[in-house]
Amino acid sequence: MATMEDMNNMSGEITLPGFRFHPTEEELLDFYLKNMVVGKKLRYDVIGFLNIYQHDPWDLPGLAKVGEREWYFFVPRDKKHGSGGRPNRTTEKGFWKATGSDRKIVTLSDPKRIIGLRKTLVFYQGRAPRGCKTDWVMNEYRLPDNCKLPKEIVLCKIYRKATSLKVLEQRAALEEEREMKQMVGSPASPSSTDTMSFSSPQEEQNMPLPLLQHVLKKESETEDMVVPKQEKITNQLVLKDTNKSTCGTSLQMPFGKEKLPDLQLPMLSDWTQDTFWAQLNSPWLQNFTPTNILNFY
């Protein structure tokens, strides 16, 4: 049993500035996982025991004992019923999907000695088989199949895959293209004052009565708005033509007279309709007097 002094020393070493936990794959399998399976308690408890499938990956960093960019957990292997013993890797908001086949891990001192297997999984948001791929990655380490030790516990390493600048630019371009397609596919509807829409007789027959009454009311209001506008334009054109004709005339009235005298015409009677009497009754013959004749000669 660890004493209080050992626990204080352990806590002090872990929290020392510059301390990092970056074990190799051989150390994870041959030391940490194997000792956990056989029940040997380690002096420094740096890897906690947690069922990570009860949490989403973005919540796991806060549940790990140590780690800044990589987080480690001992995880129980939960079997999924009715699927051939395949482990259940489903969370509340997504699922972990395996990529590729398992990779064998060997020791550096003896490359022929297999100490474990590594499975790589990627987290998808949504429900299988569909889902949105994320940048959360998990390496699941387990003991080899020929190992006589229990295999109900695995060691998982959680981290986020670094995204290159090229991939980020491609994502931004795709997002911009998608937004442009949405803008082109759904143009803004014109206002009611700019565009008038009238229903055909066939459409009016197929409309429900409340909807038809609403459409007819809107059309009537639109016509009431258009007619005064047309009358206003006509009055403006007439006024403009009147001003133009008034300003453009060259006729000047004599000084002291505001209007021209009326044109004097002879009065017509019934007997003036005769051609002969009309000639004798002309204004020139009426003024033909003896005095005028003497003046003429």
From Swiss-Prot:
Residue ranges of the annotated DNA-binding region, renumbered to this chain: 115-167
Tissue: Widely expressed.
Bias (Low complexity): 189-201
Stretches for region Disordered: 178-204
One of the record's GO molecular function terms: DNA binding
Main location: nucleus
Keywords: DNA-binding, Nucleus, Stress response, Transcription, Transcription regulation
Any Gene Ontology CC annotation: nucleus
Domain of life: Eukaryota
UniProt-annotated location(s): Nucleus
InterPro entries membership: NAC-dom, NAC_dom_sf
Upregulating conditions: Induced by abscisic acid (ABA) and cycloheximide. Induced by tunicamycin, azetidine-2-carboxylate (AZC) and osmotic stress.
Pfam families per record: NAM
Ranges of residues in domain NAC: 15-161
Record GO biological process: regulation of DNA-templated transcription
Protein purpose: Involved in response to abiotic stresses and promotes cell death and hypersensitive-like responses. May act downstream of NRP-A and NRP-B in the endoplasmic reticulum (ER) stress and osmotic stress response that mediates cell death.
Domain writeup: The NAC domain includes a DNA binding domain and a dimerization domain.
PANTHER family the record matches: NAC DOMAIN-CONTAINING PROTEIN, PROTEIN CUP-SHAPED COTYLEDON 2-RELATED
Descriptive protein name: NAC domain-containing protein 6
Gene that specifies this protein: NAC6
